Every structure is written in C-alpha cells, then in structure tokens.
Curated annotation (Swiss-Prot):
The chain crosses the membrane at residues 62-82, 123-143, 179-199, 213-233, 253-273, 276-296. This is ATP synthase subunit a. InterPro entries: ATP_syn_F0_a_bact/chloroplast (IPR045082), ATP_synth_F0_asu (IPR000568), ATP_synth_F0_asu_AS (IPR023011), F0_ATP_A_sf (IPR035908). Key component of the proton channel; it plays a direct role in the translocation of protons across the membrane. It is found in: Cell inner membrane. It is a multi-pass membrane protein. One of its GO terms (biological process) is proton motive force-driven plasma membrane ATP synthesis. One of its GO terms (cellular component) is plasma membrane. Coiled coil: none annotated. Its main location: membrane. Belongs to the ATPase A chain family.
Length: 311
C-alpha cells in the first residue's frame, strides 16, 4: 500500500489508523461514493463505514469489527493452547509448549503471591489470562503493517478496506478491558467489605477526625468522597490509556518507517533495516506492557480485598 500511486503519505497513514467500522448512519446523511456520486440516506442505516468521516458520523452506534474479531480470535488461540497443554499434562518432565506454559504459569503465580496476600482462587487464573491475552494482542504489532490489510483487501475485493490488526492500538479495546477490571474491583470490594464498608472506605479516608471532634467529619466526609471517587475512576482510565498509548506509538513508528518504501530503493532498504531494529526493541514494549497490565490488575484486586482499620 505504501507504494500505491493513488495514496499520499498522509492518506496512507490515515488509512492504517482507521478501524473497520460497522454502525448506524443517521437519516439525511450524504454518502460520497468513489465515482463522485452523492447518496442521501432516507432512513437510519446500519452499514460499513467507507470513510473515516462516516465512521465518525456513526458515533456511539458503531462497532470496530477488526478489533472485536481479532480480540476474540486471539482469546480463542490462547484458550486452545492452554486447554491442549492442560489435557495432555502428565507427571513427566514437560517439553515444548507444555514447558513454556509451565514456566509462564509459575512465573505469574510468583508475581501474584508477591502482590496479592489474600485468599481468592480466581485472581491467579485471571492474571495468567490477562497477561496471555494482552501479550498475544500486542504481538500482532510485529506483523508488517501492510501484510494483513492487503490480504483483506484482496479477499474482499475492496482496495479501500480499513483493517487494523492490533486490538490494543484501539482505545475502545484497552479501556473496555480496564473497565472490566474496574467492575471486578468494585465487586470484590463490596463482597469482602460489605456495602457499608465500601461506602465508609470512600467517605472516611484519607482524612477522619476522632470521635470527640466528630463535627469536623461533616466537612471531611464530602472532601474524602471527592478525593476517593476521583482516585477510583482514575484507575481504569490510566490502566487502559497506558496500554493504548504505548502500543499506538509503536504502531505509528512502524507505519512511518513503512512510508520509506514508497520513496525509492535506497530509502526502502533503509526502511527495512529500521523496521527490523524497531521490531527488536518493540518486543520489550510488548512484553513489558502485558506484564504491567497484569500486575496492575492484580494490585487492584489486592486493594479490593484490603481492609482499612475501623474508626
């Protein structure tokens, strides 16, 4: 695609940053076709977006098909290999994939034991699942940026098809995972502390006056509630945006390097060297971001189980 004569470098970059979007265009929306024809919709219409402007016009009533599809596919891949190893597990020394899975499970279990000091059988499997899934989604960033989009265009017969293959470069995916972690955090908080204990945690920390100065709490409780609520909401936002920002930046660098192939043979050769060098460095980003997301998820689960001293 980088060498296409119909695309400028700006068009190329914009095209690679746009998701395949299915959604509802409002009645009265004017669709501009490639042949110059303009079609005004008479009714609200569910359709695939042909341009970035159409995707934006769909607003909240839209689904990023590529993000959803690749996310589900990679989750199934992780589940398949985990189940295959579990079914074939024996008391003998593990080899091949089984050895790698054992190394992964033992390593993450060690991290969970260091961070999570409570009893909950769900947390370690959750951490393993989160790390494996996020790592696989991040790993898609190492596939050359044009390969899968071009294959999708050939199969579909649509040379303008949008097709992003790295789910974690879509903030909808990363924030969606972060919100799920946030909901689990709230669930375990209420489960472990009770609804009243959870409310007290929001209103009686970090500042609380002794009983003989109870009247100061009339001021401190609203202040505490604002501070704790902001801190609580910031957790999923920072968790999701951290993963998105790092992977999006890495993907953008790959795309910018790929534009060198359209300039000429010399720049194409330079681009190949840069692609390889950045891919090697980006492996660390892929691993670290999956690890950080997993560790923070475990930390948030530990915070949900922690009990503050009663006043």
């Amino acid at each position: 695609m980088a060498s296409s004569e119909t695309l400028t470098i700006t068009d190329y970059i914009t095209h690679h940053l746009q998701n395949m979007t299915y959604g509802k265009l409002p009645a009265g929306y004017a669709r501009h076709h490639a042949d110059g024809e303009v079609h005004v919709l008479e009714h609200d219409t569910w359709t695939m977006a042909h341009t970035a402007e159409e995707a934006a016009a769909m607003g909240f009533n839209a689904v990023h098909v590529d993000t959803l599809g690749w996310g589900i596919f990679l989750a199934l891949v992780v589940g398949f290999f985990m189940r295959r190893v579990a079914v074939k597990a024996t008391t003998d020394t593990p080899r091949g994939m089984a050895s790698f899975i054992e190394f992964l499970v033992e390593g993450i279990n060690g991290v969970v034991k260091d961070v999570f000091h409570h009893k909950n059988r769900l947390v370690a499997p959750m951490a393993i699942t989160v790390f494996s899934w996020v790592f696989m989604m991040n790993l898609m960033d190492l596939i050359p940026v044009d390969w899968l989009p071009m294959a999708a265009q050939i199969v579909s017969g649509n040379e303008h098809l949008f097709f992003k293959v790295v789910p974690t470069t879509d903030p909808n995916a990363t924030l969606g995972m972060a919100v799920t972690v946030f909901i689990l955090m709230l669930f375990f908080s209420v489960q472990q502390k009770g609804l009243w204990g959870f409310i007290k945690e929001l209103t009686c920390h970090p500042f609380f006056a002794p009983r003989k100065f109870w009247y100061f709490n009339l001021i401190l409780i609203p202040f505490n509630f604002i501070l704790e609520t902001v801190a609580l909401i910031a957790k999923p936002i920072s968790l999701g945006l951290r993963l998105f920002g790092n992977l999006y930046a890495g993907e953008m660098i790959f795309i910018l390097i790929a534009t060198l192939f359209s300039v000429g043979l010399l720049f194409g050769f330079l681009g190949g060297i840069l692609q390889f060098g950045w891919a090697v460095l980006h492996i660390l980003v892929i691993l670290i971001q999956a690890f950080v997301f997993m560790v923070l998820t475990t930390v948030y689960m530990a915070m949900a189980h922690d009990r503050h001293d009663e006043h």
